[in-house]
C-alpha cells in the first residue's frame, strides 16, 4: 500500500481488525520511511458497478464519494458513525444485488434519501435539496409536507396494528 504522505510503496500493517458491523477490515499502517500512520479499509466487492449520470456519461461507482456526500448532509448532526457506515454498507450491498452493473445516479440518489430518512430528517432534507436541485422555498415546503405525510401514515399504521392485536387478544376462544 502506498504511503499517502511520502509515496513510499513499503508500508507495514500494525493492527488489523473487523469493523463493528463486520462488513470491512480496518488496518492501521505505518510507513518505515517517513513514520506516517494511516488507516485503510478492505471491503468485499461483488461486482464492478458503473454509474450512469444524468448526462449519459458512465463513471465507476465510488463508495468514498457516496460516503462524502452523506457526511456533508449529516454535518453537525448527532448521528453515530457506525450507524452511517451500516447504512452505506447496506446500500452498496443493495446496489450490488440489483443484478445490473450499470445503475443510474437517480436510483442511487433515491436509495440514499430513503436511508437518510431512516437516520435523520434534517440530513434527509439537506441531501434532497441538493439532489433534487431545490430553487425556491416552495420546494422545501413540498418535501416537508411529504415527510410529515409519511410520518402520519406510519403512525396510523402502528395504531391499526395495535388495535388489531388488542382485538385478537380479547376474542373468545
Swiss-Prot record:
Give every ATP-cone domain span: 49-139
Q: How is the cofactor bound?
A: Binds 1 zinc ion.
The record's Pfam families line, in alphabetical order, gives: ATP-cone, Zn_ribbon_NrdR
Where on this chain are zinc fingers (unnamed) annotated? 3-34
One GO BP annotation is: negative regulation of DNA-templated transcription
The cofactors required by this protein are: Zn(2+)
The keyword ATP-binding is annotated on this UniProt entry: yes
This chain's protein is named Transcriptional repressor NrdR
Top-down, what is the taxonomic lineage of the species of origin?
A: Bacteria, Pseudomonadati, Pseudomonadota, Alphaproteobacteria, Hyphomicrobiales
